[in-house]
Amino acid sequence: MTTARSFSPLSPTPYRAVVFDMDGVLADSEPLYFEIERASFARHGITLGEAEQHAFVGVSLEEMWRTIKERYGLQPPLEELLAAHQRNVLEAVAAHTSLQPIPESAAFIRWLKRRGYRIAVASSSPIALIHLLLKQIGCLRDFDIIASGEEVKHSKPAPDVFLLAAERLGVPASECLAVEDSHNGVRAAKAAGMQVVGYRNPNSGNQDLTPADWIVTDYSRFMV
């Protein structure tokens, strides 16, 4: 693994496309999600420790609630739990107009587009949330394609959403570079056959990014 100090996977590059996760990579949204999750869990009498909650970073909402339902024996149907949580998230994000893009992410996207890279989002979030959040931070139209976790059978850390992104891009996974902030996401991209940049975001919790090929703390490392 190469550290941020010697990071240069795009200079020169074997890649034709860059595939971004969204939350914690493009938008600094994980703290808001943690807050919504704590409130949702509390309504069912559940309190998770920090490490337990951080373990869900990168997985789909459906997979998170399936695990919670099984672990704590919740009675409501999974569909009901998921629908209520999705409504809460969409309402909170729509109201939270101060959500910020990750520093330098917009500049990095422009840098990639000027150099002819195809760019994609591969997020575990529902498609409606992806569109809403990317629109809020001003980069929805910058992406060639979007792949959502609700469109595939298996959530991260399975590779499904990254394979879907590569298919829609028309680029082999081996020619895509993925950018992820979570352990689950890094594992998913690696399983898809992509090389991976782990983006170290302290707001995403204590994430083990060591399976990534490179680890960075800011996007200026790319633009060399």
Predicted regions and their residues:
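Active-site neighborhood of HAD-like aspartate-dependent phosphohydrolases
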Residues: T3-A55
